[in-house]
Regions:
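A structural motif specific to WD40 beta-propellers
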Residues: 52-55, 96, 102-105, 144-147, ...
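Loop/turn segments within WD40 beta-propeller blades
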Residues: 25-32, 67-73, 111, 116-124, ...
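Extended acidic/polar alpha-helical scaffold segments
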Residues: 779-899
């Protein structure tokens, strides 16, 4: 058949979860539609409502020291360690919502690095604070300095613009005025007209309030003895709140600039501000908790909260009136969003919990897997003690205020929950057949089983398994699907898996019986191991359970893989052959067709797949524990292997057995188990790929890497096959059409189609036929006026393509005359400006217009020189003939005399 094409396996990048924040400043616009974050030297703009990437602004080669957004979202200001300050104008595209950032200006803001920025509410003024203690105020639009303030010569740690409230003078106008009242009226008049102030906090604990109109310091507030990190002003309360690393929170009267309240927070405070029209004050710091205070009394309204881990400590915070949340930045680069409470809720206020988390970076992705029956969540082990659950559902994200509702659908890549319980880094995980149960193993020498009830927003630890002496490098749950009529099949949430297998760096494997009821929190006894076996001579890297739940395999750094009986814990076979440690092992799935080996088809117990540090993958026969085939192609260790799903076709002979592998070379490969060849190589990572998993229905491959990215690869094999068949069919139709035009003598249509199909041989044949026609048209340059018209109406792409062909033909003396004739036709058909201004995509290197014309000129000069030499030689022949004619009379006379 014409459309029968060889089957080709292809995968394309469908989604990528990338890091957006690696520490530093965070900024938001008033509508919470633009989130600006620091990613090393670059700035990232993201829509926090749907996680969409809006723009990436490349840096100047130095790390960013701080950045900010104007409240209106019109400008982005970036300061780097190179001492430069760049101001970008932001314009949102109406088509896809992305943002185009245009560099408005670059200036040297200070003689030392700028570490803090602030913008006023009108988005017109910018304040910059340097490490030398100086503060400058800039006009953002014009780009010049309006004010320069110098206080103490220590680092500026906080800046905040505010406007003092204009006080009413009505009472003062009634009756007799005292001198104090007159002074107050004069101050009120100034405040009503020139009310801009700038509060500046320094590393020495002092806070200065600068009057922008008078260009002087109106208050010097001394209460803190360490860095001032939080500054905010409330017009309703006429108060300024300051917070510092001296573990105190201070409220100041904005009229007299005297202290109203000082509260010890007993933690390093990194963020503070007013909420609910200043009636409440929030603070957050090293303990990682959001705390709410009554502004009037200074009393804490939130209940006492236990300090969180060091990684969950708060590094900075952000809130302004109108925002639907308080944004707190954690030390581990997570952005936690909290709902701001109201004072009316003070009596029932509980410990605040974030309603949404945005992971700035997932760090190294050590392991991952799909969760839930619909596989709408992915569990990530991310070089931390918590397991992150991320949404991968394709639901359309909502915009506006509804995006922050608790019942709004999570967008692709949104953090849904954290599984908190381990004390050390989680290094392995496994998921059962239903997707509701996940087992984790960590460096705290324990394994945990988690129950995932996403519908009810419940993610709880079901049981903890303690007994290993060292880190757990491998955990495995049974993958077999229970019988249709069983309770485990109909209600998997209330029927945990029957057992768990764990492997540790203590070189032992353990089988655990999973309790039918959840362990109580704080329960110390835990579950007991059914058996413990000394399994290997080195660390155990991976464990996998056979789909029948009768066998399990353990892979170790001792270069071997052992097959065990689940029931007795006895070794059934040992797989030897790898030259380095084995990182991954996977049994073949159920109902897999037979694999063709050297000794015929492999049936019976099936096969097992292993990936090793020796850069190879091996396929083993479980019947006799021999190697069927070795797969080579990775240039570094093979860290993970996983089987792809079988096609749905009923014909077993047509089912392709494929698997995927992830390597330390940063590549993901898809292999054909029967041919031993790599079907395709997937490249989207910059570091080693530790984890890979396959969607059980659509064959989507998800890979996690040390570069903090998670890539989702969509299987496009059927689309590629259909497109290739369609392209082949179209090519055949066009070739037949070309033959028909040539046969009919329709040179105009034939040349146009030959150019379109890029058939240089047929194009040359056509032009040769035109030039050698027996009845050329009078006045035609090429030989036929129809061809002249075709050559005179070509697009830029077609002209460039034809010039490429003329360049090639011109190098051969046999085809050069055709090239010269067509070149003449082109030159006479278009002005010189047409050739100099050709707009052609991809015309680079040897195919650039300059190089093409140069090659044509060089060979044309060579042909011209050869023609000149032929002309000169023709004169010599003519001269010789003339001389011979001059000798003819003498020869005739000699003949007569001889006669």
């Amino acid at each position: 058949m014409a459309n029968k094409q060889p089957l080709k396996t292809t995968f394309d990048v469908d989604h990528v979860i990338r890091p957006i924040f690696t520490g530093g400043s965070v900024a938001l616009d008033n509508g919470a539609r633009i989130l600006a974050t620091v990613l090393g030297e670059d700035a990232i703009l993201t829509d926090p409502t749907n996680g969409k990437h809006l723009a990436q602004i490349e840096g100047d080669g130095e790390l960013i020291s701080t950045l900010t957004l104007t409240p209106s979202g019109s400008h982005l200001i970036i300061c780097s360690r190179s001492l430069s300050m760049r101001i970008y104008a932001l314009k949102r595209s109406e088509d896809d919502g992305s943002i185009e950032a245009t560099l408005a200006r670059t200036v040297k803001a200070h003689g030392t690095p700028v570490v803090v920025l602030a913008v006023d509410r009108t988005s017109t003024l910018l304040a910059t604070g340097g490490t030398d203690g100086s503060v400058k105020v800039w006009d953002i639009a014009a780009g010049y300095v309006t004010h320069t303030f110098r206080g103490s010569s220590v680092l500026v740690s906080a800046l905040h613009f505010f406007e003092v409230a204009a006080r009413s003078n009505e009472a003062a106008r009634k009756g007799k005025k005292s001198k104090h009242q007159e002074d107050s009226d004069e101050e009120d008049e100034n405040a009503s007209t020139t009310n801009f102030r700038l509060a500046c906090g320094n590393q020495d604990g002092k806070v200065r309030v600068w009057d922008l109109h008078k260009r002087s310091c109106v208050a010097n507030l001394e209460s803190h003895v360490s860095d001032v990190q939080g500054l905010d002003y409330s017009a309703e309360q006429h108060a300024l709140v300051t917070a510092g690393r001296d573990k105190t929170l201070t409220w100041w009267d904005a009229k007299s600039w005297k202290i109203r309240k000082v509260v010890p927070c007993l933690e390093l405070v990194e963020a503070a501000g007013f909420i609910d029209d200043g009636q409440l004050t929030y603070s957050a710091g090293a303990n990682g908790c959001l705390r709410i205070w009554d502004t009037d009394t200074g009393k804490e309204l939130t209940p006492q909260q236990a300090a969180k881990s060091e990684e969950e400590g708060i590094a900075s915070g952000l809130y302004r009136p109108g925002l639907p949340f308080i944004l707190l930045v954690q030390v581990d680069h997570t952005l936690a969003l909290y709902r701001p409470p109201k004072k009316a809720e003070a009596s029932t206020l509980s410990a605040p919990e974030p309603f949404r988390r945005i992971s700035g970076t997932h760090d190294d992705i050590i392991d991952l897997g799909y969760l839930l029956p619909d596989r709408s969540l992915v569990a990530l082990a991310t070089n931390s003690e918590d397991v992150r659950l991320v949404s991968v559902s394709e639901t359309e994200a909502q915009a506006g205020e509804s995006a922050w509702d608790s019942d709004s659908s999570p967008y692709f890549g949104q953090d849904v929950a954290l599984l908190k319980g381990h004390d050390e880094i989680v290094i392995s995980l496994d998921i059962d057949w239903s997707g509701h149960w996940i087992a984790t193993g960590a460096k705290d020498n324990t394994a945990k089983l988690w129950r995932i009830d996403h519908a009810n927003n419940s993610y709880t630890c079901w049981a903890t398994f303690s007994g290993h002496a060292e880190s757990l490098g491998a955990v495995a749950l049974p993958k077999g699907v229970p019988p249709e009529s069983s309770a485990a099949r109909s209600d998997p949430l209330n029927n945990p898996p029957p057992f768990l297998i764990t492997g540790s760096q203590d070189q032992t494997v353990k089988k655990w019986e999973i309790p039918r009821t959840a362990q109580q929190k704080g329960h110390k006894t835990g579950s007991r191991a059914v058996f413990t076996r000394k399994a290997h001579d080195k660390d155990i890297n991976a464990i996998n359970v056979h789909h029948s739940s009768q066998l399990f395999a353990s892979a170790s750094q001792d270069k071997t893989v052992k097959i065990w009986s689940v029931a007795e814990g006895e070794v059934q076979g040992i797989l030897r052959g790898h030259k380095r440690g084995v990182w991954s092992v996977q049994f073949s799935p159920a109902q897999m067709p037979a694999i063709q080996g050297e000794d015929g088809a492999v049936t019976g117990k099936g096969v097992v797949l292993t990936g090793s540090g020796d850069k190879t993958i091996k396929l083993w026969n479980l019947a006799n524990y021999t190697c069927i085939r070795t797969f080579e192609g990775h240039s570094n260790s093979v860290l993970k292997v996983a089987w792809l799903n079988m096609p749905s076709t009923q014909d077993q002979s047509k089912k392709r057995v494929q698997f995927t592998s992830a390597g330390g070379d940063g590549l993901v490969k898809v292999w054909d188990a029967n041919s031993g060849e790599a079907e395709c190589t997937l490249d989207n990572h910059e570091d080693r790929v530790w984890a890979v998993s396959v969607h059980p229905e659509n064959n989507t491959i998800v890979s996690g890497s040390g570069d903090s990215t998670v890539t989702f690869w969509k299987d496009t094999s059927s689309e590629t096959q259909a497109a290739a068949s369609q392209a082949a069919l179209k090519m055949i139709e066009q070739e037949q059409e070309l033959e028909n035009h040539i046969h009919a003598g329709s040179f105009r249509e034939a040349i146009t189609l030959a150019l379109q199909l890029n058939h240089p041989g047929r194009l040359l044949s056509l032009f040769t036929s035109v030039m050698t026609t027996s009845n050329p048209d009078k006045g035609s340059l090429s030989g036929l006026k129809a061809v002249d018209e075709v050559l005179g109406s070509l697009s830029d792409e077609q002209i460039f393509l034809l010039l490429l062909r003329l360049r090639d033909w011109n190098t051969n003396a046999r085809t050069a005359p055709v090239a010269q004739r067509i070149l003449l036709t082109l030159i006479r058909s278009y002005p010189a400006s047409k050739f100099s201004n050709l707009s052609v995509k991809g015309a680079q290197g040897q195919k650039s217009l300059k190089d093409v014309l140069h090659a044509i000129r060089v060979y044309t000069e060579r042909h011209y020189k050869r023609t000149e030499e032929l002309v000169d030689e023709s004169y010599l022949v003519e001269y010789t003939l003339q001389e011979m004619d001059a000798l003819a009379p003498a020869l005739d006379e000699d003949v007569v005399m001889a006669g």
